[in-house]
């Protein structure tokens, strides 16, 4: 019933302690394990079947193993269930350094100054990077399949922050302890700016403008109204004529929940320069 397998070991350990008496409160018993992939139903079914014991079913004979239609057991299935399968960040890389990011405590602010002297003095610190070290090139953190689907609206380390947690400095050190200690010593002085937290308010006249200066060339439709993309007449035909010819029209404002297709496993990649100077990821 699992898909990515990241939550499987925790689910399996918890499920191993359950009895038939726990089934009426199964969701509460399993609340300490989160799963992004399954919607939990197949996990409930599997646990219930395991707790209740084998059930004799009537029906057609099972398909012979190895034939067409037979279940295929993934090569890593047993290792994943047992928590033995290494994930990307479980693999040690010889000579690797540790990076920690300092995030903004403000939703919208301009950085006045950053004092990194104390952080650089921590033993084991290799570098402390800020917007003064970052290229001026802008990009998007949207990360869709094609880069041009998203606006060029921020630098990798920007001198203006637009959400709580946006990175303002990066500490690189030989150990995690040194990186953590140095990150706590980075002192940032902010000029706090007005912030906006509602999409309708963001489009109203007088709302704080988050990306002034961005243009359609940056793939920002209307920076003065905080609008990154919009559809106009001409997309899909003559909208006014079609509505006029319709037997029934319905108007209103509809809202839907946000969907994030995000796995539980930390986003991670391992990269290095090979002997030919090529970046391998």
Pin down the residues of each PLM region.
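Short, well-structured alpha-helical segments that form the helix of a local strand-helix-strand
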Residues: 24-30
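Short active-site oxyanion
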Residues: 2-4, 167-170, 278-281
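Local cysteine-cluster metal-coordination motifs and their immediate loop/turn environment
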Residues: 1-17, 31-45
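Flexible, low-hydrophobicity surface segments
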Residues: 48-222, 249-252
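Short cysteine/histidine-rich zinc-coordinating motifs and their immediately flanking basic loops
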Residues: 16-21, 48-52
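Predominantly extracellular/luminal regions of secreted and cell-surface proteins
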Residues: 120, 128, 233-242
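Conserved beta-alpha junction segments in alpha/beta enzyme cores
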Residues: 238-281
